[in-house]
Amino acid sequence: MLNLAWGESMNLPKFLPYFLLVGLFSVLFAFNAHVLKAQTVSLDHDGQHDFDFEIGTWKTHLKRLLHPLAGSSQWVECQGTTIVRRVWNGRANLVELEAHCPSGNFEGLSLRLYNPQSHQWSLNFANANGATLGQPTIGEFKQGRGEFFDQETFNGRAILVRFVISDITRDSCHFEQAFSDDGGKTWEANWVADDTRMKD
């Protein structure tokens, strides 16, 4: 400890290295505390349970654009039921959709898998007609909104696909798929669904 007698004058050049050393340690301590706090926040929210809100049975109102990226405005509306089941303690879930459309019944399935290394989800969709999983959209939730992207070929064109989950409450949520053929500058929605939880 630095101890100066009353009335004794301080020789600043003599004690300058001491003050510089104290200041340096203070800065390093504050920086390390900030990094540790950021790491703790990141570990606390790893995203594994981001889809827990959706577990259960939902009434689904679905709209599909019949001819995406063709300048069309012809939509078809469907009514159906969505069932979401938790798998692997929340690290995956299985979605089953059955909808009644003007042209007949539509059945879809989505397998969602959580990657603990990247802290991201992959959404893998299939319908009963194709019976194979499509290209997964990959992304994460931030501030209550999920955004997932992938690149695909549609009618011979390279496109970007965006799938958004928003307006999440305990009893409702909104889904929207959109395509872009200009590198993400503009997006055209082609699949919109609103889910309302069905009471037990």
Each language-model region and where it sits:
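Short, Lys/Arg-enriched N-terminal segments with co-localized hydrophobic residues
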Residues: 1-9
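Short stretches within intrinsically disordered, low-complexity N-terminal or propeptide regions
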Residues: 7, 32-35
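N-terminal Sec-pathway targeting helices
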Residues: 13-17
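Bacterial N-terminal signal peptides
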Residues: 18-30
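Hydrophobic small-molecule pocket/channel-lining residues, especially in calycin-type beta-barrels
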Residues: 34-200
